């Protein structure tokens, strides 16, 4: 019986060892990003490949937050009848997830944003319907309390974020009439508006503890949106990105990028954030090469990545998003966060001590658990996780962060637990991937780098080339002086040009490609009479002549004298006239009592539209046989007949 029991104990130990030492694929343990869709939570790795999904029993998920100290995710379901906020943890035995109710539903809540304080273990959330911000402890059944009430002032709280190190809560007020970004102490005191101008409708917000900055999304008017950043007090405001045709809700920040969910495209997008942690690329004195200089070849050019990247396509509408930040490793030496991290770690360690060793089997399991975490990682039985020391990562702390990180340099971990490269002489860049000689020397010049890091690299130029970058062709320059020497033999010639002039004279070649040198065109005599200049000159002369001709013709017509108008005056006297038998009232008109004067213009001054001064038919009949005196008589006689 003892042997059978001992065999069963050994078998059980082996089974447990297999479970502990085998990576739990398909579980949320290895994830780097978590995104809430409408009906599930999707876990993804660093390359945005889906590794697991959870919370399928819910219908309307929205916001979520992450407790990295205990590996718990808190999320909200808008349609659940009993609960409002739930927690998601990993089952150690079944290797899957378990969702539990954390905050009971008290009414028609509409959670807009979630945040968690790992020190006091409190949840904070915004209610867009009641226009208030609540908080409640995750353990126990305490009634949620109001931290901020915006209903009286017409505000609408949306995104919330906790500054764990400085003990403050930040939120966005998406009221379109008076949008703001505000903060308050976690105890409810010292409420402050930090952003109130040049903002339309702020949505999600996050506190980046690594850079001590705020990042938030602003849904601008029309189809535009922006991602903005500032210091924790609202100063040093920067626009990280401005684009259009997105409907972003929430965002997450890592060391080098910003990620946000977009409801329009059903995707997760990323954009580089401004690097705050400067990577040192200087050379360490004890690692310098003993030689005075080193030869380098130009590396291959590095292509730039698109700043706006669609990292994940989702099957449903994307809403909340969280990312791992390495809370323990990154902030252990931060002067604002070191004390908070220490207190949180002490609390987690106290919970781990509750798993006491009671038998030999437990001792064997304990040994296997300790062996699960590599590189002195600390095993957490409550969460089945390894807390890795600085410089290591992975589910078992098996990955060294400096491994293959620096291309031409030595890697060390910085005070903020990030890899930092000390570059070899002649290299630069965040990972020492760029050569200082890249593109420096021209025309086949050879780059030389001194061991003194303060001394700039130099170029060794081939024959007949000079300059700091071998950009000057000495043959082309000296050829100009050679031409001048033919006319002024006593002029000054730079050193070395005499021998080149002799070579050119022996070569008897005049086809020197002087215009090919980019700086010599200023020394050449410019060609004035080019074809374009001649064409413009001819066109200008012809146009000037035509203009002068038009002006002269206009002046002549303006000052040309008019033709004289010839006027003749005839005095007609009254004559005795007897009435004939054939006179009628129409033919026998009354005559003037005295006399009248008739002015007759010369017909040569009349045009065709004027009334002629005599009957043309009568003139035709008498033209051949009448003299000038008879014409006048006929004309006067007809005029007398026309008078009334």
From Swiss-Prot:
InterPro entries, per the entry: 6-blade_b-propeller_TolB-like, Cueball_EGF_LRP_Nidogen, EGF-like_Ca-bd_dom, EGF-like_dom, LDLR_classB_rpt
Signal peptide: 1-26
Pfam family, one: Ldl_recept_b
SUPFAM superfamilies: EGF/Laminin, YWTD domain
Gene Ontology annotations for the cellular component aspect, listed alphabetically: plasma membrane
Mapped LDL-receptor class B repeat ranges: 121-166, 167-211, 212-257
Subcellular location: Cell membrane
Residue span(s) of domain EGF-like: 398-430, 433-471
Residue ranges, Cytoplasmic side: 553-644
Positions bearing carbohydrate: 82, 108, 175, 190, 313, 473, 508
UniProt keywords, alphabetically: Cell membrane, Differentiation, Disulfide bond, EGF-like domain, Glycoprotein, Membrane, Oogenesis, Repeat, Signal, Spermatogenesis, Transmembrane, Transmembrane helix
UniProt cross-references to PROSITE patterns, sorted A to Z: EGF_1, EGF_2, EGF_3, LDLRB
Coiled coil location: none
Extracellular topological segments: 27-531
Record-linked PANTHER family: PROTEIN CUEBALL, VITELLOGENIN RECEPTOR-LIKE PROTEIN-RELATED-RELATED
Similarity field: Belongs to the cueball family.
UniProt-recorded name of the protein: Protein cueball
